[in-house]
Amino acid sequence: MAQEFSARFARHKDELEWLFMELYNNREGLEVLEREMADAYDARNAELKALDKARAADPNWYKRGNMFGMTMYTDLFAGNLKELAKKLPYFKEQKLTYLHLMPLLQMPHPHNDGGYAVEDFDTVDPALGTNKDLENLTRELRKAGISLCLDFVMNHTASTHRWAMATKAGDPWFQ
């Protein structure tokens, strides 16, 4: 585990553990989460680790008066992620500092609760592009000083999601 992650984790460990145990009362699950967090940090690229470090040094970065965001439906604004990337000059002209894209993740079609019935939290909806398209867009936004925001709302899980299917099938772990 990198020294920077270890130091940051140590600052927040007590709060994380308290919240997790209040919600789940599952010490083993907490240990799994902590290992997964360390593994995820190790897997982050150098560019994101540098951004983490800069933001940790300036914890109020997101409270500045120059923060200006835009929320949009990707499909309605640009059709897909590749077309959205072509709007970068417009975003820069607007002095955008963060962009919140809704909904973006794989969903069942046509019954998807306006895009909020998520079928796969790890995959961009094919109608909007690919995970690689999202990575490319994110990198270009970051170069322009724009942070990407996405929603991960677990109660927006589609009935066709593997978790829901396992629950319906009677899997006790998912129930």
Question: What name fits each language-model region?
Answer:
Residues M1-Q175:
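Acidic/aromatic-lined carbohydrate-recognition and catalytic surfaces
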